[in-house]
Design a protein with these regions (language model features):
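Short, C-terminally biased terminal segments at protein or domain edges
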Residues: 1-123
C-alpha cells in the first residue's frame, strides 16, 4: 500500500467516524463519547501526513506512534459504543474492523522504520 492510499483510508475512516458521532444519542454519555471519538478518530490522517514529512527517521517513528495511539483510543470508544448499544453492532462492526486494520498497518510501519533506523545506526 502506498502512503497516498493509506492517507485516503485514514481520511475515509475520519469521515465515517464523523457520521457515527453525528448518529450518537444526544445524552450525556453520547456527547462525551462523541467528543472523544471525533478527536481521536480524525487525528490519525493529519498525523500520518505529518509523519510523511518528518525531518528524521526518529521524528517519523514518533509521529506514527501518535497516529497509532489515536487509532487505539478510537478503537476503545468504538467498542464502548457497541457495548452500551448506543448504535447497532452491525453498523459499528465495519468501522471497528477498519480501525483494527489501520492499527496493524501503522504498527507494522513503526516496526519497519525502527529496524531501518537500527541498520543505519550500525553502519
Amino acid at each position: 500500500m502506498t502512503s497516498d492510499e493509506l492517507v485516503e483510508r485514514l481520511i475515509d475512516f475520519a469521515a465515517r467516524v464523523g457520521k457515527v458521532v453525528d448518529a450518537l444519542p444526544d445524552t450525556r454519555m453520547g456527547r462525551h463519547i462523541g467528543g472523544q471519538l471525533v478527536r481521536s478518530g480524525t487525528s490519525p490522517a493529519p498525523n500520518y501526513e505529518e509523519a510523511c514529512a518528518a525531518e528524521s527517521r526518529a521524528d517519523f517513528v514518533h509521529k506514527l506512534s501518535i497516529c497509532l495511539k489515536e487509532l487505539r483510543e478510537s478503537r476503545s470508544w468504538i467498542r464502548l459504543i457497541i457495548k452500551t448499544e448506543m448504535l447497532p453492532e452491525h453498523r459499528m462492526g465495519e468501522l471497528l474492523d477498519e480501525c483494527n486494520q489501520l492499527c496493524n498497518i501503522i504498527a507494522r510501519s513503526i516496526v519497519t522504520a525502527k529496524k531501518r533506523k537500527e541498520k543505519t545506526d550500525k553502519h
